[in-house]
Amino acid sequence: MTLQEEIKKRRTFAIISHPDAGKTTITEQLLYFGGEIREAGTVKGKKTGNFAKSDWMDIEKQRGISVTSSVMQFDYDGKRVNILDTPGHEDFSEDTYRTLMAVDAAVMVIDSAKGIEAQTKKLFEVVKHRNIPVFTFMNKLDRDGREPLDLLEELEEILGIASYPMNWPIGMGKSFEGLYDLYNERLELYKGEERFATLAEGDQLFASNPFYEQVKEDIELLSEAGNEFSEEAILEGKLTPVFFGSALTNFGVQTFLETFLKFAPEPHGHKKTDGEVVEPLSPDFSGFVFKIQANMDPRHRDRIAFVRIVSGEFERGMSVNLPRTSKSAKLSNVTQFMAESRENVTNAVAGDIIGVYDTGTYQVGDTLTVGKNKFEFEPLPTFTPEIFMKVSAKNVMKQKSFHKGIEQLVQEGAIQLYTNYQTGEYMLGAVGQLQFEVFKHRMENEYNAEVVMNPMGKKTVRWISPDDLDERMSSSRNILAKDRFDQPVFLFENDFALRWFADKYPDVKLEEKM
């Protein structure tokens, strides 16, 4: 198979949702169809101990939430599928946003009983900004939920995206009978031994079923007033195909997968800092680090840099340029993933996600190139933290473990580190409280370093140029610090303190991140 043919087989997507909409469950079902797991059952399993395949970190298993992005790969129907299962919890939106830079499409999972929720809306905005295709899975049809027409209306009114239903539920909850498959013009049956029936057979099966009559009325209404199906509009991110189903009972998931793979885009190009796009079929290898994860195997205390291959082909042992440091690195120990299990990989192509063992060489956002190519891709989004805590080692004898843990967790992008210019104190910044809890848990369990954390409350953060730096600017209301890249930054007590500073030092430019 040629390189071009291999690249065209790739389908790389992220699954986004509000917490508890069923994102991890549908991930398990997709892996089941891909032959990667033998059974897919109730995913959370807090009481039973049946943990989700993609929730591998200890704290995720304890709390039943996804706090890191898992990467999984399988083959199905002639396609090589790369799934990125993103954190649903809002405190981990940084990791999710960066992950969304590494995919070509997104699957949006919505709880049909609740409709569009806050986190779904946030994540959709990021996807919309990138103009990548969105495929919607309306989940939990095995329970009573909202009317299907209301759910479609919500997509258009709240998210501002046109929708096209690929299938339509026949009843729901205890009265759920199956799906009327508009795209394939057939019925998918929830009960009985047969999976599918023709529309003519459906008229006989559900002759006296009031829900079936309602379905036919809804479909007639949609054919007259609904949006037209357009593959072009889907690929441009202007139209979302909507699939109904139940991930928990594995109903409608396989149909979704098969249809998704038919319409999901091939790998796309990526912009360099000069605005030029590097295309997947370019023969020279290039990629970027979108995530770093420490301790995926606690026995070995390892670090993995997750790389999205943008162009060309990876071959084991190849040397790459790291433009940020002007140095080169050899890619000899590289893996691909199925959540916590992994295997060595000898080659991979544009669209694939690979894991590079990292001894501290890489940072999130790094570009990897080969030969004389030493360009950089556009930077990944960075986020301004909102709440802060001072942190120190509880046991002075554990300073080495303490510093190693902080260094690795900060490089992951899981939390941000600031150092007080005058006192040298460490301060952690996060977008939500859960990040601090996870940091503390991981420091104690993965690095054997207990920590003392003292709240500093909310701060307004602004960066300044090193040329404008004057330590006399610092006060109790605006703490002068440096970030992990040694860039000077002020932590203002509130917006009033920020305005006061701006008035006093009008020539100092204050910069804000996302």
Curated annotation (Swiss-Prot):
The keyword GTP-binding applies. InterPro entries: EF-G-like_DII, EFG_III/V, G_TR_CS, P-loop_NTPase, PrfC, RF3_C, RF3_dom_3_sf, RF3_GTP-bd. Signal peptide: none annotated. One of its GO terms (molecular function) is translation release factor activity, codon nonspecific. Residues 8-268 form the tr-type G domain. Its main location: cytoplasm. Keywords: Cytoplasm, GTP-binding, Nucleotide-binding, Protein biosynthesis. The keyword rRNA processing does not apply. GO terms for biological process: regulation of translational termination. It is found in: Cytoplasm. GTP binds at residues 17-24, 85-89, 139-142. Disulfide bonds: none annotated. Transmembrane segments: none annotated. This is Peptide chain release factor 3. It comes from Streptococcus sanguinis (strain SK36). The gene is prfC.
